[in-house]
Amino acid sequence: MSEKKGATLFKTRCLQCHTVEKGGPNKVGPNLHGIFGRKSGQAAGYSYTDANIKKNVTWDEDNMSDYLTNPKKYIPGTKMAFGGLKKEKDRKDLIAYLKKATSD
């Protein structure tokens, strides 16, 4: 896994809609700080779809990988417009970056 490659993926595929820093703003998508260990649909100040709230999953590496493979399949009704990362290596790299960038 490569955090560096994950950071590049985040900048090119995620940054237009998400922030990762503590206290960062919600954009089109929610701020992701503290995402691991948090339940879906629970970022403060972000207006989620009922689908995200009702999924009621606690984010970890495994289910985040499943979600990033095909977000609309994992949570039908999500407003995340991202089509997904099909390559497992890309998902692992992105998750390695997110684990570091979204923690305290």
From Swiss-Prot:
PROSITE patterns: CYTC
Principal location listed in the UniProt entry: mitochondrion
Any one cellular-component term (Gene Ontology): extracellular region
Residues annotated as binding heme c: C14, C17, H18, M80
Keyword Disulfide bond: no
Alphabetical UniProt keywords: Electron transport, Heme, Iron, Metal-binding, Methylation, Mitochondrion, Respiratory chain, Transport
Residue numbers bearing the N6,N6,N6-trimethyllysine modification: K72
PANTHER family assigned to the protein according to its UniProt record, in alphabetical order: CYTOCHROME C
Functional summary from the UniProt entry: Electron carrier protein. The oxidized form of the cytochrome c heme group can accept an electron from the heme group of the cytochrome c1 subunit of cytochrome reductase. Cytochrome c then transfers this electron to the cytochrome oxidase complex, the final protein carrier in the mitochondrial electron-transport chain.
Family: Belongs to the cytochrome c family.
Protein name: Cytochrome c
